[in-house]
């Protein structure tokens, strides 16, 4: 969902499926925040982002999936006793490893926007106007 989208010409793009949310806070300082997986984090971070987004600052909010780690389950020992005579067969069974997705991380990026300052041109012929 979107949070505070469209203040001051701000643009909010929410990417579903990819898990990425972009919020451009240009033109009044308030932009939309695209929430992909963590709405509580987005709600808590919305006022701070809106205030911090000065007209000279572009704040992008991305929701990046957390680090996926490989979880190796412990091996299972199977014992089998065959009678008679007492024969003990012990097998070590290793289950396949599972890929566990970690919690999503919300990354706030502040990129200074490019501000073109007007360079005053040297005023030629200024003294000639005074004569």
From Swiss-Prot:
Transmembrane segments: none annotated. It comes from Locusta migratoria (Migratory locust). This is Cuticle protein 79, isoform A. The tetrapeptide (A-A-P-[AV]) repeats found throughout the protein are also present in many proteins constituting the protective envelope of other species. Sequence repeats lie at residues 37-40, 45-48, 53-56. The keyword Transmembrane does not apply. Keywords: Cuticle, Repeat. GO terms for molecular function: structural constituent of cuticle. Disulfide bonds: none annotated. Component of the cuticle of migratory locust which contains more than 100 different structural proteins.
